[in-house]
Design a protein with these regions (language model features):
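Acidic, polar-rich low-complexity tracts and alpha-helical solenoid repeat scaffolds
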Residues: 1-183
Length: 183
């Protein structure tokens, strides 16, 4: 726990992250002690900083379930949504994770409209909406390149209807005009 190296099968292994070990030990030694909620929350932050989003989300969920009266419970809800958003922004855009993140951010804003984090949550909702519009537009482009024009139109119309004032709606409208000229 103090940065000591561990051995496995005779091989010395470095400590991955001392903070994770420390926070885990605090929680194990005093699950309902006064430092446990902060340790659980900070464990989630440490995991999130290492891009271990699912584990971080689990840690934040434990803050909410084990310490519902903690002032960190509110921040944990925001962090859960943030983890979902991070997963959705990965190299393989995950529409399901993006939808979950958007719903969790919206729920956070509904439950905590005056919280400082609500402004950031609203900003994240807008970013997720934009990312979804971009993804839908790109699917339309894919179908257009495959000469599946009717399918492309469906996706372009979806972008226009869901996000009429976005740059992606403008692009989709332009593509629709080009498809109409093809006829």
């Amino acid at each position: 726990m103090s940065g000591e190296k561990r051995k496995a099968m005779g091989i010395t292994l470095p400590v991955e992250n001392p903070a994770i070990e420390i926070f885990t030990k605090v929680i194990e030694n005093s699950t309902y002690g006064p430092l446990a909620p902060a340790a659980q929350y900070k464990l989630g932050l440490a995991l999130k900083s290492l891009l271990r989003y699912y584990e971080a989300e689990e840690s934040f969920n434990k803050v909410i379930s084990n310490y519902p009266d903690s002032e960190l419970s509110e921040a944990s809800k925001f962090q859960i949504a943030s983890c979902r958003a991070a997963v959705s922004r990965g190299p393989d855009y995950d529409q399901g994770a993006a939808k979950e993140a958007k719903e969790k951010f919206e729920e956070f804003v509904r439950e905590h409209p005056d919280a400082t984090l609500s402004r950031e949550a609203e900003k994240n909702v807008q970013e997720l909406i934009e990312k979804d519009a971009e993804s839908t537009y790109n699917i339309g482009r894919f179908y257009e390149k495959q000469k599946a024009y009717d399918a492309a139109k469906i996706y372009y119309e979806d972008v226009i209807n869901k996000t009429p004032y976005s740059p992606w709606a403008e692009k989709a409208l332009e593509r629709m005009r080009l498809l109409e000229k093809r006829k």
